[in-house]
Curated annotation (Swiss-Prot):
Keywords: ATP synthesis, CF(1), Hydrogen ion transport, Ion transport, Membrane, Thylakoid, Transport. It is found in: Cellular thylakoid membrane. F-type ATPases have 2 components, F(1) - the catalytic core - and F(0) - the membrane proton channel. F(1) has five subunits: alpha(3), beta(3), gamma(1), delta(1), epsilon(1). CF(0) has four main subunits: a(1), b(1), b'(1) and c(10-14). The alpha and beta chains form an alternating ring which encloses part of the gamma chain. F(1) is attached to F(0) by a central stalk formed by the gamma and epsilon chains, while a peripheral stalk is formed by the delta, b and b' chains. The gene is atpH. HAMAP family: ATP_synth_delta_bact. This is ATP synthase subunit delta. Belongs to the ATPase delta chain family.
Amino acid sequence: MPLLNSVTTPYAEALLQVVNENLQTEEMVSEVKQLLELINDSPELEKALSSPILETDAKKKIIIEIFSNKVNSSLMNFLKLLADRQRIGILTSILERFLEIYRENSNIALATVTSAVELTDEQKGLITQKIINIAGTEKLELVTKIDPSLIGGFVASVGSKVIDASLASQIRKLGLSLSK
């Protein structure tokens, strides 16, 4: 992914610089997350934006039609710029890189917690505190996923650290120790 980062990083840094100058960072981070969610939920949109067949003007019309009421003017101008420079096809990578740089600059760790069932707010709070202690960071962004195959418990990952407190893992370990 280093080659893609060499393309996405300048755009992501430019967007971050614009929002920092306009003091819109938190608002922009929220909009970028919503935009990523919208694109990830719509494979047709992602195909259209990355299609080499569609002309730049057609892509800009799609952007204006879909995003004009959903994003602020700075982000809209950024999307149009990407279309003009024929980089709109890597929009998700640019936005993900923007969030990575934002987290790095703000000392925010990204943690993914996968559980067998939906976690309550109390459970999320407890897990967040444990992960903050382990990761040695002040702030944490928690992404939750559900995987019923875990049976119970959770698996949390922050960077290269993984905490496997799942029932499936414990059963697997028990099975391995019994087979010896």
